[in-house]
Amino acid sequence: MGGGWWWARAARLARLRFRRSLLPPQRPRSGGARGSFAPGHGPRAGASPPPVSELDRADAWLLRKAHETAFLSWFRNGLLASGIGVISFMQSDMGREAAYGFFLLGGLCVVWGSASYAVGLAALRGPMQLTLGGAAVGAGAVLAASLLWACAVGLYMGQLELDVELVPEDDGTASAEGPDEAGRPPPE
């Protein structure tokens, strides 16, 4: 069985690479009392964070776009499954049973995409260089889109029935008794 040479090479490299990372890092002992947590005692005492470069901004922008694309993919798949459910719902009684499955699948896609986006925003807010307000706006937009989808599917399935009653305006000119000009009986 040929081709196994790379496995041994990868295992050797992994052993060499991880040997250093499994050991605790050596801390330099410079100045100050042992175990002091006072400011000014440490390797980075008084150091300000490095300035943000154009490359860091570009990386943050790419990370945000990739994150938004992932959400939009899940949302698109949820809309597609819901659309198939709408078509199936109109076909027949058997189609109605299948439509509920498609609506459920669409809902799972929308909920999973929205939840993963919100959790990712909270976890990656620093690397994305987002302010708290920017992250809140992003999460709010995703929540609004998800609620809009849920309302649309609920209305379509009849769970949120809206009864609209048209009441004709009575201006006093029409007679309440007898047929109208076309010979139709009065509405009841």
From Swiss-Prot:
Sites of Phosphoserine modification: S48
Gene Ontology terms: cellular component: mitochondrial inner membrane; mitochondrion
TM spans (from-to): 102-122, 135-155
Segment annotated as transit peptide: 1-96
UniProt keywords, alphabetically: Membrane, Mitochondrion, Mitochondrion inner membrane, Phosphoprotein, Transit peptide, Transmembrane, Transmembrane helix
Compartments, as annotated in UniProt: Mitochondrion inner membrane
InterPro entries: TMEM160
Location (main, coarse): mitochondrion
Domain of life: Eukaryota
Membrane topology of this protein: Multi-pass membrane protein
Family according to the record: Belongs to the TMEM160 family.
PANTHER family for this protein: TRANSMEMBRANE PROTEIN 160
Protein name: Transmembrane protein 160
